[in-house]
Amino acid sequence: TARFPAKLVHGHIKQLVDQELPLIFYPCMTYNLDENQSDNHYNCPLVAYYPEVIAANMDLNNTKFLYPFISFDNEKNFVEKMIKAFETVDIHFNKNDVKIAFRTAMNKYRDFHEELVQKHIDAVKFAREHNLQIAVLCGRPYHLDPLVNHQINQLLTTLGFVVVSEESVPR
């Protein structure tokens, strides 16, 4: 059976379909980005292939649903798959534009993590300067959904903790 966060996807997709969007892009991703932090970088099967569950089990009305298998591990492969996938719905991209978009996204992703680490350093410094406890919240990306996380970060903050994410901790 699907875990609760996976079931939330149905509600999010329904909201998009109700807006009568012409296309929803929700790719299947066997692998997550390899951040060289573990032996592998597989996504959980439910996360990786849930777009197939949506395609097979939801009434999408007239909304096209594009769910190609993609990976960020190989730029050339990513660019080719994206171009081919969007051509199936009569959307055409220039190969060089997709390459630039890929590289820009990877750079922004790296910059985001560098900024996150700096925010962590600032938060720890603040906590030490003010003699506050630090709580590290660990979880999955879907834990950002307030329905899933029950605002535990806000609760911890009201209890006097400085809250940082697992992802922000310098490696």
Q: What feature does the model see in each segment?
A:
Residues 1-171:
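An N-terminal assembly and electron-transfer interface module characteristic of large anaerobic redox
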